Amino acid sequence: MGKSEYSEDALIQAPTAEFLHQELGWDSVLAQDEGPLVAEGLLGRTADTQVVLTRDVLAALRRLNPGLPEAAYTQALEAVVQNDSTKTLVQMNQEKYRLLRDGVLVKFRDAPGTGTGQMVEKRLRLIDFDQPGRNRFLAVRELWVRGPLHLRRPDLIGYVNGLPLVFIELKRFEVHVDSAYKQNYRDYLDTIPHLFHWNALVVISNGHDAQYGSITATKEHFYRWKRLDEDDPEPGPAQPLLPLLLQGMLDQRRLLDIVENFVLFDATEDGVQKIVARNHQYLGVNRVMARLTSETQR
């Protein structure tokens, strides 16, 4: 590892992972320690092309949808890892988003002695959006991912129940945040596109400035998250924005809320655009919903 890489890891990557772990309750691993790619390994990957952590997905399927035949879980996992090369990245992302929100439809026969023995259709949940504690949030640093032609190592991937929902590219303080977008993120979209099939948020930061967007967003449509509450003051010019973004978007309950309720696929003349709500929209809508809930409970 060169000096610049060491500095980037020591000054930005490691503290970001530590913040997710200590402040927001995420598990955190350094993929340099992954070791042999075997099912019993650190992440359960058996090939460096794999971006979905199937061991965690299966564990979540069993945990959130208990009492079903094993064939139901296996069928759901097959749908999760399925990759259709005839579809665009945006089409795949929209398809996976439906599975994320609505669950995976499976068909299976009732187990003998527990049902009628008939074929049953059921949607299996991949995530418990109501109880964050029933999900596994895992930050993985420096995971090697192999694409059709290239091998890449993203800085940090945020997994929920084995699904790579968050991509974070980090630069040193003195490097402009645009570099993370132009030199790294755009390259990863081209060289390891399957990493983004499940992506919900793209985050770029140099430790001070921090911005987020969707997989279809141009750099002009990456935004900052400056407030945790509508009444919070505007952060000063010397205040680092990365901790605010992490708290505002990657707090476990907030992340699930954003993924479930604040993502939109919009068909435009230029194609389908994926839109993630901006800071003020998220806070404003939730304030209205809280007020309505309070009024109905009186």
Regions found by a protein language model. Give the residues of each.
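ATP-dependent helicase/translocase motor core
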Residues: G2-R298
